[in-house]
């Protein structure tokens, strides 16, 4: 049986990935596998710039709306789901098109997963209790003692990752930094062609981000977050779903911690920082072809032709 093939289209947020993916779908019988850690959540449509109903009707999309905002999704589960979907899509005679910008998931898919333990509910509850009693700063100082390398890499207010790093240490007796340094060789069970949209004009990307954020507000983003607070009362500012860019800033605004203008400025700034991190990841990622989404169009046309050649069409 031939080895399955998959074409990956990567790029920063607001960089034209969805538009190009739909153009590819006009040319090839593809099914899209979302590479976006925010799109997995139901009831979070506006702030995640989720593909519209008409776009999802035009071409099948996978790994969208698969969990509630109070549930969790991981890189390990993405690798499992994506690998399975590549096989299923290929068996249907279609071409898998992986589209998104969650580079941690892509790295896990292409380079393999570290041998980290699964989350432990009892230990996590104990860490949460310590945070409530002594504060997040106490947990961060503890991490500095047992895993200074990871502590240096994390921000002191990164509650989720600080908790996870301590969890790994307490479960294994070894710091997370040691686990990450012992990654085993990884062989993909499919052929992969990796393309990326990398804008040369960063000012244009920043402008797109601001325009899209304001459009989200017009579409009812604040109301969407208000609905999340009502429908899922266990959500907090530290919940993984609310850590999605824009949602944390909206949450703070609804808590009364910021005014509307500050919320907008912080939301746009956070999205631009996300794009910067994504571009940093992309510079370290082996790429088969690159296009500028803001060029005259011929650059993106080359990516479409590259996809056709890769799939032998």
UniProtKB/Swiss-Prot annotation:
A GO molecular function for this record?
A: ATP binding
GO biological process assignments: tRNA modification
Q: Return the annotated site residues (Interaction with substrate tRNA).
A: 102, 124
The residues the record assigns to binding ATP are: 11-18
What Enzyme Commission number(s) does the record list for this chain? 2.5.1.75
| Segments of this protein annotated with the region Interaction with substrate tRNA | 36-39, 160-164, 243-248
User: Could you tell me which InterPro entries the record lists for this protein?
Assistant: Dimethylallyltransferase, IPT, P-loop_NTPase
Q: Which cofactor does it need?
A: Mg(2+)
- What keywords sit in the KW lines? ATP-binding, Magnesium, Nucleotide-binding, Transferase, tRNA processing
- One Pfam family from the UniProt entry? IPPT
Q: Which reaction does it catalyse?
A: adenosine(37) in tRNA + dimethylallyl diphosphate = N(6)-dimethylallyladenosine(37) in tRNA + diphosphate
The protein's superkingdom reads Bacteria
Name the residues that bind substrate: 13-18
Q: What the protein does?
A: Catalyzes the transfer of a dimethylallyl group onto the adenine at position 37 in tRNAs that read codons beginning with uridine, leading to the formation of N6-(dimethylallyl)adenosine (i(6)A).
Quaternary assembly: Monomer.
Concerning its family, UniProt says: Belongs to the IPP transferase family.
Q: Which HAMAP family match?
A: IPP_trans (MF_00185)
State the name under which the record lists this protein: tRNA dimethylallyltransferase
Species? Neisseria meningitidis serogroup A / serotype 4A (strain DSM 15465 / Z2491)
